[in-house]
Amino acid sequence: MRQADVTRNTSETKIQISINLDGTGKAELASGVPFLDHMLDQIARHGMIDLKVVANGDAHIDDHHTVEDVGITLGQAFAKAVGDKVGITRYGHSYVPLDETLSRIVIDFSGRPGLEFNVPFTRARVGDFDVDLSIEFFRGFVNHAGVTLHIDNLRGINAHHQIETVFKAFGRALRMALAVDPRASGSIPSTKGSL
């Protein structure tokens, strides 16, 4: 069973995350940051991952610590649920459009953290959400999941659409990369024999 429960407690946040990589896209989300919950729902639905997130952060300061720490904890949960990576496809990619916007995600469960984030946001905020926090979320995820992730917004005018297509494409790329390949049963997808 590719599932994990991870808790992260710091002086700034308290995060609890449960995931099931072989789920149906169900999500129970209470991060305290409504726009982040909306984006996490995209990951769950498009990744077919069951996801539960409960977070309490120092929102009286701002949402930075909560968003970043949810990314960190989610990355830890993915690393735990994926385990030794035996039989997974390893690579995933997705293009997702939303009206005028088009974004691309490419991911590699390589064990090597790396993030390329190319999203030329058209405004600084979507409602109360600081768009720069999206890079903090993905940086936290990448560093703790041990993945290489390329995020490119290829075109877009509406900043909400830019972020939403990134998160939808991320979910779909995860789904592809984490799919179990029956032909690779018992093997690790690397010529090195380990990831």
UniProtKB/Swiss-Prot annotation:
**A GO term (biological process) for this protein?**
L-histidine biosynthetic process
Q: In which pathway does it act?
A: Amino-acid biosynthesis; L-histidine biosynthesis; L-histidine from 5-phospho-alpha-D-ribose 1-diphosphate: step 6/9
Which terms are listed as keywords in the entry? Amino-acid biosynthesis, Cytoplasm, Histidine biosynthesis, Lyase
Q: Where in the cell is it found?
A: Cytoplasm
Can the keyword Amino-acid biosynthesis be found in this entry's annotation?
yes
Under the cellular component aspect of Gene Ontology, which terms does the record hold?
Answer: cytoplasm
EC number of this enzyme: 4.2.1.19
Q: Which reaction does it catalyse?
A: D-erythro-1-(imidazol-4-yl)glycerol 3-phosphate = 3-(imidazol-4-yl)-2-oxopropyl phosphate + H2O
User: GO MF annotations for this entry?
Assistant: imidazoleglycerol-phosphate dehydratase activity
Keyword Amino-acid biosynthesis in record = yes
List the Gene3D superfamilies hit by this protein, alphabetically: Imidazole glycerol phosphate dehydratase, domain 1
The record, for PANTHER family, names: IMIDAZOLEGLYCEROL-PHOSPHATE DEHYDRATASE, IMIDAZOLEGLYCEROL-PHOSPHATE DEHYDRATASE HIS7
Question: Which family does the record claim for this protein?
Answer: Belongs to the imidazoleglycerol-phosphate dehydratase family.
Name of the featured protein: Imidazoleglycerol-phosphate dehydratase
The organism of origin for this protein: Polynucleobacter necessarius subsp. necessarius (strain STIR1)
The lineage, from the top, is:
Bacteria, Pseudomonadati, Pseudomonadota, Betaproteobacteria, Burkholderiales
